[in-house]
Amino acid sequence: MKTAVSALALAAGLTLSLPVLAESRTSYGPQLEGFSYPHPLKHYRFESQGKPMQMAYMDVAPTGQANGRTALLLHGKNFCGATWERTIEVLSEAGYRVIAPDQVGFCSSSKPEGYQFSFAQLAHNTQALLQQEGIDQVSVIGHSMGGMLAARLALNYPQLAEQLVLVNPIGLEDWQAEGVPYAHIDQLYQAELKTDFDSIKAYQQKFYYNGNWKPEYDRWVAMLAGMYAGEGKERVAWNQAQTSEMVFTQPVIHEFPRISTPTLLLIGGLDRTAPGANRAPDEVAKRLGNYPELGRQAAAMIPQARLVAFPDLGHSPQVEAPEEFHRALIEGLQR
């Protein structure tokens, strides 16, 4: 009897694990052709650096009483516009039109060869997309790498950004100045080629969720892994290496005192994200990614900044605790 029960339990466990296993091996294509976005994708087609490009984006109308405002959502390096799924719903219900693009080199947008990536270039591309849509002012909300891009957008196009929200942005410290060794693109590319579902999940569990994991996070891991799981993975890996180098060598923090836009910092205090810390000496690595302190320092540097801390949350508070996060976001935007 005990053997039969054990066998049934094992079978049940295997059955439950099959969807995750299958999802972890799914190839969605280098531009996520096979991944289902929460809203229809539009495509902004343009030429940049002599090459034809397309930026995919979601353009979601307000479902609540329209307030005449537009929210621009900028994804992080290990995220896509789709990861903003619940935030899009909340903002739309609050009356916002929501624009959520995938940046060039990421997710469902072009994966160009020979492209010179910079935050200024990505900000320009995004501004041009908004211009095409007839949008002249936005509340800019950037998460992780998207926070660095949001800051650059606010600096380069101050007339465009009426509000700035930085959600656990990376780049609140200058890693190279702190003593993290430089890694060239060829090194980063070789590391990117090893990316798969398990490596993405392990990284996110350690740095984003403080060792915890919920089954609903698997979808976002599978989304990223799906770009590496089939044909085209080399182009994906190369663009990811290029943008890793961009993040490391193009700090925005030194310009924070020049940000004139009213700014809201939403900071999960358990976040320890610090790109390059794995190659830094121990004495350097251990002081990096101290987000409670980094958040306070950033709030002091930006002239019109307000800090809201989530002491028990990590790198992705909008995913980890959506109700708490979105309550703070909406309250902050309405001030």
Predicted regions and their residues:
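An N-terminal hydrophobic leader/cap segment in hydrolases
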Residues: 21-46, 55
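Flexible "cap/lid" loop of the alpha/beta hydrolase fold
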Residues: 151, 155, 164-195
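N-terminal signal peptide c-region/cleavage motif recognized by signal peptidases
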Residues: 17-19
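Conserved HGGG/HGGXW glycine-rich cap/lid loop of the alpha/beta-hydrolase fold
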Residues: 49, 53, 58-108, 319, ...
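Active-site loop/oxyanion-hole signature of alpha/beta-hydrolase fold enzymes
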Residues: 45-51, 58-64, 93, 103-141, ...
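Conserved alpha/beta-hydrolase catalytic His-Asp/Glu region
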Residues: 195-256
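Conserved serine/cysteine hydrolase catalytic core
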Residues: 229-295, 300
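Catalytic active-site module of serine/aspartate enzymes centered on a nucleophile-bearing elbow/loop
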Residues: 292-335
